[in-house]
Amino acid sequence: MAEPLYTRDILKLATSIPFEERLEIADGRAEKRAPICGSQMACDVCLDDNQHITEIGLDISACALGQASAALMGQDIIGRSLPELKETLRQLKAYLAGEIEDVTSWPSLMALSAARPHKGRHGAICLPFETVIAAFEAAMVAKTEALPA
């Protein structure tokens, strides 16, 4: 028998998203939408001089899987770099597609394994990482533009 999609653990995660408040001052901001399911997320980030996340603010309107993914991301996001986030998104997409068996860069994402056969939910699961990457990239552009000529 197939594992239920909305497990007790996923539902618990969906109600425990950290950093669920936008930042007043941020280095970068982004808003993204998952086209298939309509989930939406806004993200604000602050970076240190070494280009690692020091603060994050989230506003998410998504299904329980998207919220659970945001919660798992939020648990371990502080101190992460852009290459780490991009590698995690790459692994997450490959894991959901059945191409790899685990997400070594962010092991807690394995809690979303019940969603692997549900391709229509993959966009909501990837949305938190796509949005934080976009906010990070916006911060990098803003910092570059702020450099003296």
Could you say what each language-model-derived stretch is?
Residues 1-21, 30, 80-149:
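C-terminal binding/interaction regions
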Residues 8, 26, 43-44, 57-59, ...:
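Generic ordered-secondary-structure signal
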Residues 16-60:
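Structured beta-strand/loop patches that form or line metal/cofactor-binding pockets in enzymes
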Residues 37, 65, 117-121:
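Secondary-structure capping and boundary motifs in well-ordered enzyme cores
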Residues 41-42, 51-52, 74, 84-87, ...:
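Short, surface-exposed, polar/charged, turn-prone segments marking secondary-structure boundaries
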Residues 61-67:
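Short, thiol/selenol-centered motifs that function as redox-active sites or metal-ligating centers
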Residues 69-81:
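Alpha-helical support elements that line or immediately flank enzyme active sites
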